């Protein structure tokens, strides 16, 4: 039985487009978003992976499921008048069933905040099914959520590793253009492959962050 995707309003990610790799424009967008987050004082400090196929979400619905999950997080932090920023990149395996379609998220959580068990509840609400083990994996970047401030060199080193990991599904042209250390096709993805929070996209469009 196909899992339902919980509709929570807001914009609907594009569902019909099919791609097999990140484009040059998408890789550039991710890099700009990471720089913008740093300059805005909301550096990414949390790495989240959600295995949507394992959760029972159809590939065509995965972008909307990701948007719903991030809206839960945004609403939770917004209720405390706290900022939230993120980028996400979807991937798929090569049809061997090793991982299925999934999404990597780099997010900023304000100091002292944790999504903890809330995330599993959000997954249940999105899928309409019981939570399965290892659907969601999350960890702080550079071992501590405040590493960008306390150990900036270690933080930047670890962030660069995660950036390259998220970009490993870039096209050959993108990998060559940005001298990415590793490259392979990111698997077939139906719908939107890359996204970011509105506060980052607005700052990029306005040019307010140098």
Residue ranges with predicted function:
Residues 1-99, 109-210:
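Right-hand nucleic-acid polymerase module
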Residues 102:
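A short acidic, Gly/Pro-enriched loop at the edge of an enzyme's catalytic core
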Residues 105-106:
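Long, low-complexity, serine/threonine/proline-rich intrinsically disordered regulatory regions
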């Amino acid at each position: 039985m196909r899992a339902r995707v919980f509709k929570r309003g807001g914009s609907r990610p594009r569902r019909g487009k099919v791609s097999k790799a990140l484009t040059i424009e998408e890789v550039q967008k991710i890099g700009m978003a990471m720089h913008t987050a740093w300059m805005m004082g909301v550096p990414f400090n949390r790495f989240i992976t959600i295995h949507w196929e394992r959760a029972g979400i159809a590939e065509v619905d995965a972008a909307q499921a990701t948007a719903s999950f991030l809206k839960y997080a945004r609403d939770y932090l917004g209720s405390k008048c706290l900022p939230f920023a993120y980028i996400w990149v979807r991937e798929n395996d090569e049809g061997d069933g090793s991982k299925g379609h999934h999404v990597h998220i780099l997010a900023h959580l304000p100091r002292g905040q944790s999504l903890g068990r809330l995330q599993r509840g959000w997954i249940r609400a999105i899928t309409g099914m019981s939570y399965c083990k290892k659907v969601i994996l999350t960890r702080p970047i550079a071992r501590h959520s405040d590493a960008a401030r306390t150990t900036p060199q270690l933080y930047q080193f670890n962030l660069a590793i995660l950036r390259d990991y998220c970009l490993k599904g870039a096209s050959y042209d993108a990998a060559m253009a940005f001298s990415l250390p590793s490259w392979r096709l990111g698997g077939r993805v139906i719908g939107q492959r890359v996204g970011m929070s509105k506060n980052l996209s607005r700052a990029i469009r306005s040019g307010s962050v140098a």
